[in-house]
A protein has these predicted regions:
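A short, charge-rich alpha-helical start-of-domain segment used by transcription regulators
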Residues: 1-19, 32
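Arg/Lys-rich amphipathic alpha helix in sigma70-family domain 2
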Residues: 61-81
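Structural recognition of an alpha-helix C-terminal capping motif at a helix-to-coil junction
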Residues: 19, 33-40, 44, 53-65
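Pre-signature/interface helix of ABC/ABC-like ATPase nucleotide-binding domains
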Residues: 7-8, 47, 78-81
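Short alpha-helix-to-loop micro-motif enriched in aromatics/charged/Gly
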Residues: 49-51
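Acidic-residue sensor for enzyme active/binding pockets
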Residues: 30, 37, 77
Length: 82
């Protein structure tokens, strides 16, 4: 997959990913931040994407993993505060 095709696919799933991010976060601003972080991570790891595999599934996995990592970080920080 060339860079143009990758970015075209990335733009095509943005709206759907935003809805998924909102379901995860229940907050518009956090959903936008999660979408942006996911898009940047995908662009940074474009070379790791295997062409002819499920691009949308790959993006959902990145988003879910970022959300889980952020959640764990928040819980860990709250544990230290208490």
């Amino acid at each position: 997959m060339n860079t143009y095709s990758f970015r075209k696919d990335l733009l095509a799933v943005q709206e759907e990913l935003l809805r998924f991010a909102y379901k995860l976060t229940a907050d518009r601003e956090e959903a936008n931040d999660l979408l942006q972080e996911t898009s940047l991570k995908a662009l940074d790891n474009e070379d790791k994407y295997e062409p002819d595999t499920n691009f949308k599934g790959w993006m959902y996995t990145i988003m879910r993993n970022i959300f889980i990592n952020n959640y764990r970080k928040i819980v860990r920080e709250q544990t230290f505060v208490e």
